Amino acid sequence: MLPLALEQVSFAVNGKIIIDRVSMEITEGLRTIILGPNGAGKSVLMRLCHGLLDPTSGSIAWRGISNGRSRQAMVFQRPVMLRRSALANVAYGLELAGHSRLESALRARDVIEAVGLAAVMDRPARVLSGGEQQRLALARAWALGPEVLFLDEPTANLDPGAARDVETLIGQIRAGGTKIVMTTHNLGQARRLGDEILFLSQGRLVERAPVDRFFAKPASAEAEAFIRGELPWN
């Protein structure tokens, strides 16, 4: 279903421009990190790519097709947990995707074990820790076998140990052949998990570069200031 092509994509709310004429192509292979200060438009851009939002102008197409959502998934910073067990949370998504109840239960159990949640799979999902809930959300998405997985700040609210577990799991998913596209504020995490950086500032795609080059020699004043930890200007 890749590449995903955005052509002059803009998104506005009540006249306020959130995404400003972004053109880019997301291809197979590389781990793509979307980086930028608060309010840069990272999460909105992810939702546009995923299909949760429609652009105000411009076009978004998967391999030339305007609707390619069937082979991709998204995990949010604060995932919604259904009022059922951890295992049933995963199985339910599989049933909605058209799998039989038996097939869904077996696949859900395999994935729950793979993400290290076997010991809590019968507990209500809503009583799990934040780190466990994030791994469960990743398990729900992974179980569907997506070609592309969008991750919106997946460790933003987690302690260091839980964040490490989630990073390890992201590596597992990527090793299985899934394309990772992820937002983060964490520069160290971007270095660890990314191959390329898409840097946003005030809704514009300011820079795109390999991770090492981006951090060693940013091509824009905005990116250089962001790396130094300076507050963005208006």
What are these regions (language model features)?
Residues L149-D152:
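Catalytic Walker B motif of ABC-type/P-loop ATPase nucleotide-binding domains
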Residues L102-V120:
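Conserved ABC ATPase "signature" region
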Residues A190-R192:
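A short, surface-exposed alpha-helical micro-motif characterized by mixed small hydrophobic
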Residues P124-L128, E132:
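Conserved ABC ATPase signature
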Residues H50:
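Helix-to-loop junction immediately C-terminal to a conserved catalytic motif
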